[in-house]
Amino acid sequence: CHNQEILEWETSCSSGKIVESHIDGLGHRVQNIFIDNFNGQLKITSKGILKTKDLSGIVKGLKEKVNPLCFLRDTDLTKPCEKIEKISNEAKKNNKNIIEFAHKLNLVVSNSINYVSGSTTISTSSKDALKQKKGVCQDFAHILISAARFNNLPARYINGFLLEETNSGENTTHAWVEIFVNDLGWIAFDPSHKK
């Protein structure tokens, strides 16, 4: 990624060993782990030092390996439903441009369900999360992706590590969305945090 440089990186696994490392078709580093006797628990630890640049959530100028139009396809978790159409219609009111619409769409999605830890699983669809009116970060992300794609905006699921500014030690994995805008690039949105 052009806004970060990896200075040091190390990955370890409690119940196995890393046997192969390669770059996938999207340009991501993949590490394969071999586990001889799986005991039901697996702890993977990655640590490193990165040098980053603040780009205000906009990723521009990357040499993409995948055309953004590929991120218009529905998945089982992001198939649009009637509630996605309602979210879209609400977000379409009074927008001057596509960026303003994307921000409004993010806000409407942010207000569409309540964040309730443990209320869903990794297989919960955007439709199901909207139906029960609660979910976690991945559900907010799936809903925003569904709504963006419904409006012909390429959108992709991003996950990473959320660094809490309170230094409480409660840092965790997190999911958010990037929406592609022509002539600008990918813009990050975090609907579960209304950002």
Where are the regions a protein language model picked out?
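Short, conserved charged micro-motifs
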Residues: 57-58, 187
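Residue-level signal for pocket-adjacent positions within structured domains
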Residues: 21, 25-30, 67, 125, ...
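Hydrophobic/aromatic-rich core segments of domains that either
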Residues: 139-195
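A broad, low-specificity signal for short, low-complexity segments enriched in glycine/proline
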Residues: 2-11, 116-118, 136-141, 149, ...
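Short intrinsically disordered coil segments
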Residues: 9-11, 59-69, 191-194
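Intrinsically disordered, low-complexity N-terminal segments that are enriched in acidic
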Residues: 1-55
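Generic structural "secondary-structure junction" signal
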Residues: 13-15, 28, 35-37, 52, ...
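Secondary-structure boundary elements
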Residues: 45, 50-54, 60, 66-135, ...
